[in-house]
């Protein structure tokens, strides 16, 4: 058997991992055989044997220490006091300090200045555990000016417990709110009336003796006052008055509204003086009716609204005679629109002017048409030229015709020199008159004297000059 090669250099990694006890089998005493156990190996043998018993621990790795050996200062973890973490408490600056009396955080035994929290009273700190020191929170024993005071009765505290404060805990003090014991001046509500010092001699409830101050009607010993509510006779001017002149609501007195115990003026009764309606006579139809002319409503003398005598509403003597054709109509002379005397509807002597059917009674009809005036024009009509008025007209008629021509040309949208029914309706509204569709149609056909279905400028101007 050939021996292995020389071992690796001492201290190398190969040497560290290859040093293992090797047992060589051979004859004792023979050359090359291993010595007996316990004898140190010869130098140069492999593996090299260390002094000591066989199987002893191998030497540690360089730079390492065996477990359990105390460490050198600066190592981690330090095993000696003064290191971090300290294993033996009580050294200054350590964390946590285990011995009392040393400054540190947190202190285990209270009472030291600057510690948190202070356990002994009398030291400034937060929060104090035993009250009574000024400036501590919360104060358990009330001091003047503190909030909230625990013991009442000190000035300026809240809530005050003594009189004059808000809310008072002991009732019956003047000015307190609410007073718990009645009978104090200014108390609310008074429970038992205080006798008026200015009251006349006598027991409450007697005539001439006023009730106690602050008493409410209906309490024992409180007499009913004059004008009390309900059911008593009130003084003059009380509310509600019972039968006094001018009161509201009065009960049967002259001038009352409404009179309860008088003849009623509506309808047909003879009213009292000052009743409503104030005129003598019924409403409607009696003398002095409302409004105050003699005659009924409508159609009598002095009717409403104020027509001439014997005129109905509007413009009738009575029902069935000339309903809309009288000269005494409600629409008076020249009213609608801009008519000459005796004309109501433009240019007519009847209430409805141009081409209208006037009811005479019920059933009979009559027609009245517009008569166009005859004017002499010097030149033929031209839509592109300015309108030429007839010869020999007064200035005010000329002015009306020029205004009508200007309005006509505004609504002649197609510059044809004629107006359709729709354009004519807009023109009438432009001039400030508003008719129904049927009225506008009748007026249109009354002006259209040539039956062309449209209005020429001269037809319209001639009609307007008559208004």
From Swiss-Prot:
**Under which name does UniProt file this protein?**
Calcium-binding protein P
Mark out the compositionally biased spans (Pro residues).
1-10, 45-62, 75-109, 118-131
| Chain segments carrying region Disordered | 1-311
Q: Does the keyword Repeat apply?
A: yes
Which residues does the UniProt record annotate as the domain EF-hand? 399-434, 435-467
UniProt motif XYPPX: location:
45-49, 75-79, 83-87, 94-98, 104-108, 115-119, 125-129, 136-140, 146-150, 157-161, 165-169, 176-180, 187-191, 221-225, 238-242, 247-251, 256-260, 275-279
Keyword Electron transport listed: no
Q: Name one GO molecular function term.
A: calcium ion binding
Q: Where does Ca(2+) bind?
A: 412, 414, 416, 418, 423
Spell out the Low complexity composition-biased ranges. 63-74, 132-145, 153-193, 215-246, 253-311
Identify the keywords attached in UniProt to this record, alphabetized. Calcium, Metal-binding, Repeat
Record-linked Pfam families: EF-hand_7
The UniProt entry, under Gene3D superfamilies, shows:
EF-hand (1.10.238.10)
Q: Which InterPro entries match?
A: EF-hand-dom_pair, EF_Hand_1_Ca_BS, EF_hand_dom
Which domain of life does this protein belong to? Eukaryota
Give the species this sequence originates from: Dictyostelium discoideum
Q: Which PROSITE patterns match?
A: EF_HAND_1, EF_HAND_2
């Amino acid at each position: 058997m050939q021996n292995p090669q020389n071992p690796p250099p001492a201290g190398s990694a190969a040497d560290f991992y290859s040093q293992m006890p090797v047992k060589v089998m051979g004859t004792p005493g023979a050359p090359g055989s291993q010595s007996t156990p316990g004898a140190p190996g010869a130098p140069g043998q492999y593996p090299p044997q260390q002094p000591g018993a066989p199987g002893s621990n191998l030497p540690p790795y360089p730079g390492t220490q065996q477990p359990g050996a105390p460490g050198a200062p600066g190592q981690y973890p330090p095993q000696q006091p003064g290191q971090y973490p300290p294993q033996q408490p009580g050294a200054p600056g350590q964390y946590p300090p285990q011995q009392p009396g040393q400054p540190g955080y947190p202190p285990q035994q209270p009472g030291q200045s600057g510690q948190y929290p202070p356990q002994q009273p009398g030291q400034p700190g937060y929060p104090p555990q035993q009250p009574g020191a000024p400036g501590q929170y919360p104060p358990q024993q009330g001091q003047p000016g503190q909030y909230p005071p625990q013991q009442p009765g000190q000035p300026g505290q809240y809530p005050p417990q003594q009189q004059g404060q808000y809310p008072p805990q002991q009732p019956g003090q003047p000015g307190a709110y609410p007073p718990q014991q009645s009978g104090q001046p200014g108390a609310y509500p008074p429970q038992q009336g205080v006798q008026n010092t200015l009251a006349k001699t006598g027991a409450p409830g007697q005539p001439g003796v006023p009730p106690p101050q602050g008493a409410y009607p209906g309490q024992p010993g409180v007499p009913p006052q004059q004008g009390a509510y309900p059911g008593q006779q009130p003084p003059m001017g009380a509310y509600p008055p019972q039968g006094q002149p001018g009161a509201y609501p009065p009960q049967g007195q002259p001038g009352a509204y409404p009179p309860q115990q008088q003849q009623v003026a509506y309808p047909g009764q003879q009213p009292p003086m000052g009743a409503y309606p104030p005129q003598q006579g019924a409403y409607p139809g009696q003398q002095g009716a409302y409004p105050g002319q003699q005659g009924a409503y409508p159609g009598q003398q002095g009717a409403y609204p104020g027509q001439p005598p014997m005129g109905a509403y509007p413009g009738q003597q009575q029902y069935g005679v000339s309903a809309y054709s009288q000269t005494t109509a409600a629409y008076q002379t020249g009213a609608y629109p801009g008519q000459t005397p005796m004309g109501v509807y433009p240019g007519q002597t009847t209430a409805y002017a141009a081409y209208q059917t006037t009811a005479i009674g019920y059933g009979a009809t009559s027609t009245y048409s517009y008569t166009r005036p005859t004017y002499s024009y010097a030149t033929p009509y031209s839509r592109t030229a300015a309108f030429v008025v007839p010869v020999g007209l007064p200035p005010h008629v000329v002015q009306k015709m020029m205004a009508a021509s200007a309005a006509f040309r505004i609504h002649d949208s197609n510059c044809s020199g004629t107006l359709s029914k729709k354009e004519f309706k807009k023109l009438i509204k432009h001039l400030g008159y508003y008719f129904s569709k049927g009225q506008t149609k009748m007026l249109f056909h009354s002006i259209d004297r040539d039956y062309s279905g449209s209005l020429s400028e001269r037809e319209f101007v001639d009609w307007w000059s008559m208004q």
